[in-house]
């Protein structure tokens, strides 16, 4: 149970209708999953509008409703809070409800068209091998140390994501490596999270069925780095034409990697064969049981 007033910390509220001194025991964006004592957040999605299911959520036991527009008929026993953007509110509220857990771990987000899964998984395996208890959130699977958790999206919805991070923290994870898709950024699924760092791999003309224009796609990816605080790091691919654009407005400490130019992390392929990759990274020769130039970038 938590006081709703505390969960609403930093949410941009437009109006409040109904009793305010209430406690909630759950947050939901799916009216079918609402139970007694829950707060229902009506999000406007790409396929459906949560505002159409407010009445169903109340019937299932919701005691509070977060929405962008009040329904036509109000219930005297329900608290209605109108916000500017329900999706943004969901991210912030989930962050607060689960104890602002992303601030208690080292959370690193990886974005880009290609390489997200590989980079996040490599970091997970590297830090696990160094003795850290880690979490992984990826398209292939989510993992809490050695325990595998089913994955349904590249980046889960805000409530599921914060719940998962809370489980990781409760299990003793100190580091979490997460794929952050452009869809998730555009839909504010990572809103409210504190990232210790962000990594950009590359960008190509994919997902334009969703983002419509390449500029909108770039803008979505870039928003991860725009939101990073000065205490975080931002690492980008200098060989991608948009690599520097991604970091142009970030407050984070900037780093670049490259196979072509002298940067913070400079790599050179010595050999690429069926036996693996032989690389020189910042004058240190290393061998990896992976092949291909694309994996050389992922390893950097």
Language model features by range: what are they?
Residues 1-92, 241, 266-271, 287, ...:
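N-terminal leader/targeting and accessory segments in enzymes
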Residues 8, 90-238, 242-252, 282:
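Phosphate-binding loop of NTP-binding sites
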Residues 16, 35, 43, 48, ...:
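Short glycine/serine/threonine-biased micro-segments
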Residues 27-30, 43-44, 69, 83-86, ...:
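Fold-independent oxyanion-binding glycine-rich loops
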Residues 40, 65, 80, 198-199, ...:
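Short, well-ordered beta-strand core segments
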Residues 72-73, 142, 183, 262:
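Positions that flank functional sites
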Residues 76-84, 149-152, 251-258:
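Active-site regions of enzymes building and remodeling cell-envelope glycoconjugates
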Residues 211-218, 222, 248, 252-300:
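Adenine nucleotide phosphate-binding catalytic loops in nucleotide-utilizing enzymes
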